[in-house]
Amino acid sequence: MRDAKIIVVDDNEAILRSLRTVLSHEFKTIVTVSSPVLLPALLRNGDVDLVLLDMNFGTGKQGGGEGLFWLDRILELKNPPAVILITAFGDIELAVSSLKKGATDFIVKPWDNENLIQALTHVLER
């Protein structure tokens, strides 16, 4: 098990449960929250290694703007954690925009568990 603290942010409780189950077998601390509004308090201590952040919060939202907003807020921190964005509504333009803004990776739902773990491990080993 890797000694890492990961925060998963998604408004879908089923996604949060699934990610917690998958990731808890590989990483020491998994914190799940359904709203990005909670991120500033969770990141205050600087002990988070990675944030897995959904890009859309709320019914009918598909543009990724919320995820990009919160990516910017995270990267403004003194020592920001790595951020991997995850979405069901991804396209090449959104992925490129996310990476240019500073995301370390971009994952499309539904994900492959093995590929997800490899992506997180790769980012954490940097």
What residues fall within each predicted segment?
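C-terminal output helix
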Residues: 93, 107-120
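Short hydrophobic/Thr-rich beta-strand motif most characteristic of the beta2 strand and flanking loop
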Residues: 27-37, 42, 62-63
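Short amphipathic alpha-helix used as the core "switch/output" element in two-component signaling
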Residues: 60-79, 97
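Non-catalytic signal-transmission and effector/linker regions of two-component phosphorelay proteins
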Residues: 1-7, 13, 20, 37
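Two-component/phosphorelay signaling modules centered on CheY-like receiver
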Residues: 13-31
